[in-house]
């Protein structure tokens, strides 16, 4: 199993505007080798009117066979396109300068 294989599989199942998969396995002590800790960001309008729990259920059900056999931890960030745009705007508009020792 590779990140690219997971990405292609998810893209074949739902209408994805953006997907990014990160392998965080190296940050964890776990006895198995390979992909054990994944973080996935998915932007899809298929998530419109879906609760966060339902969004995660959709993705977990698609990856259930992979999860039970190989993946120890899966972090999901699921957004609609509008939610993602709002999140990006809030992130950039909340930038604050920190003043230390009277130097900006």
Swiss-Prot record:
Transmembrane segments: none annotated. InterPro entries: BolA, BolA-like_sf, BolA/IbaG_stress_morph_reg. Coiled coil: none annotated. Pfam families: BolA (PF01722). Gene3D superfamilies: BolA-like. Signal peptide: none annotated. Belongs to the BolA/IbaG family. This is Uncharacterized protein BU473. The lineage of its organism: Bacteria, Pseudomonadati, Pseudomonadota, Gammaproteobacteria, Enterobacterales.
């Amino acid at each position: 199993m590779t990140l690219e294989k997971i990405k292609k599989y998810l893209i074949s199942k739902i209408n994805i505007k953006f997907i990014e998969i990160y392998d965080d396995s190296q940050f964890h002590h776990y006895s198995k080798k390979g992909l054990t800790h994944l973080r996935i960001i998915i932007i899809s309008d298929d998530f419109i009117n879906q609760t966060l729990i339902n969004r995660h259920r959709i993705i977990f059900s698609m990856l259930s066979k992979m999860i039970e056999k190989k993946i120890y931890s899966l972090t999901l960030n699921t957004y609609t396109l509008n939610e993602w745009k709002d999140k990006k705007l809030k992130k950039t508009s909340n930038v604050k300068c920190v003043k230390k020792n009277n130097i900006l």
